[in-house]
Amino acid sequence: PVTFPYEGTPCDNRNLNRTTMFQYMEDKSSNQWDFKRFNTEHFKRFDKRIQELMVLGIEADLILFHPYDRWGFDGMGAENDDFYVQYVIARYAAYRNIWWSLANEYDYVKTKTIDDWERIASVIVREDPYVRMRSIHNGPQFYDFSKDWVTHCSCQGTDRHKATELTTEFRNKYKKPVVWDEVLYEG
């Protein structure tokens, strides 16, 4: 990344490229972040992108957490997670094209439990005055989309035929819209 959400010092990223991108560090202790001081320049870049998408009529599914994190933002602890989510909601909820995605491939984020995801969801529900769309994206394990806070089923799958079958099944089961985010990674 060019910028980071917090003030502080990241681990050494000099050798980070397309080839090394998925070689994750188990020890993230070389990152030195102040989780109480946001890097506003980082968020200004997002401000601009979200506004540009809005002008184009494109929805922005804002992913709050992800498992591909060598910087330690996936393991900040409950207090810092909640503070981060409150900040992001205060900053972006007023954009009419924002959706909240608690995580990309939530089941690969080993630092969070289902209770953590439910707590984070409750922060979003409590803090978002505009009641933007909310969901959580899966890896191999679908989330329980029957939860009241979930507004739509955010799904990933690599089999387009199975996705078609599951769309009907999920619509009938959860009575919510079904969005397939990564069907065969088109594009």
Question: Residue spans of the language-model regions?
Answer:
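Active-site mouth of glycoside hydrolases
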Residues: 1-163
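Glycan-recognition surfaces
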Residues: 146-187
